[in-house]
Structures are given as C-alpha cells and as structure tokens.
C-alpha cells in the first residue's frame, strides 16, 4: 500500500484559513495558529452581529417613529401611537412607518390622526 502524504490537503486547509484572515493585523494573517483562532473568533462575531443588527435596526426605526409622532403631537407617545394603529386596524410594520415618517410627512400625519381617533 502506498504511503499517503498530507501536504496537499493541509496546504488547501491552510490556504482557506489565510484567505479568511486576509486584512488581519500582524501575525494573525500569516501564521496558521494565530490565523485559525482569529478567523474562528471573527466568525463568532459575524454570527452574533447578524442577530444584533436586526435589534439595532428595529431600535432605530422605533426612535424615528417616536420622533415623528412627538414632532406632530406632543401628547402622543410611540407606544400610544402603535396602540392606536392597532385599534384602527392599520397593519404597517415599523420599518415602513419610519420610512413614511421621513419621506412622506403628510401621509405620516394622516396615520397619526387615525391613531389618535382610534384611541379617543
């Protein structure tokens, strides 16, 4: 039986790790031990932050909606506005609401009025 040398497979594995470590600083980009742990950690951060990104955007949309609502009516808060929209039967998600608040103030004002009417 022929002797199997592992050079080709290990070189391919190392090459894959170094490609992922491209742009890293110092030893982390050109020694396999440092690069492997750095790449593993970077993948953990990437996985975690894909989840965190969703939370951050939702928080941003809520802040924008709240600012838009309070600019139109000082007595109305974000939570009461959302409650009013629900009671009025208007189903618009927060992403669209924040976009409307920024780009179409007249339409947003109409939504605020409908929400206030539903609360009264």
Curated annotation (Swiss-Prot):
A GO molecular-function descriptor: rRNA binding
Entry keyword set: Ribonucleoprotein, Ribosomal protein, RNA-binding, rRNA-binding
Domain of life the protein comes from: Bacteria
UniProt record, GO biological process: ribosomal large subunit assembly; translation
Pfam families, A to Z: Ribosomal_L20 (PF00453)
InterPro entries on file: Ribosomal_bL20, RIBOSOMAL_L20_CS, Ribosomal_protein_bL20_C
Assigned GO CC terms: ribonucleoprotein complex; ribosome
rRNA processing found in the keyword field: no
Role, per record: Binds directly to 23S ribosomal RNA and is necessary for the in vitro assembly process of the 50S ribosomal subunit. It is not involved in the protein synthesizing functions of that subunit.
Name of the featured protein: Large ribosomal subunit protein bL20
Native organism: Xanthobacter autotrophicus (strain ATCC BAA-1158 / Py2)
Taxonomic classification: Bacteria, Pseudomonadati, Pseudomonadota, Alphaproteobacteria, Hyphomicrobiales
């Amino acid at each position: 039986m022929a002797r199997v040398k592992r050079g080709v497979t290990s070189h391919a594995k190392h090459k894959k790790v170094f490609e992922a470590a491209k742009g890293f600083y110092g030893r982390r980009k050109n020694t396999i031990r440092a690069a492997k742990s750095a790449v593993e950690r970077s993948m953990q951060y990437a996985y975690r932050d894909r989840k965190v990104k969703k939370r951050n955007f939702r928080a941003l949309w809520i802040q924008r909606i709240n600012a838009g609502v309070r600019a139109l009516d000082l007595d109305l808060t974000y939570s009461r506005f959302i409650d009013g929209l629900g009671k009025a039967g208007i189903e618009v998600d927060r992403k669209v609401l924040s976009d409307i608040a920024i780009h179409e103030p007249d339409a947003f004002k109409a939504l605020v009025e409908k929400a206030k009417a539903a609360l009264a």
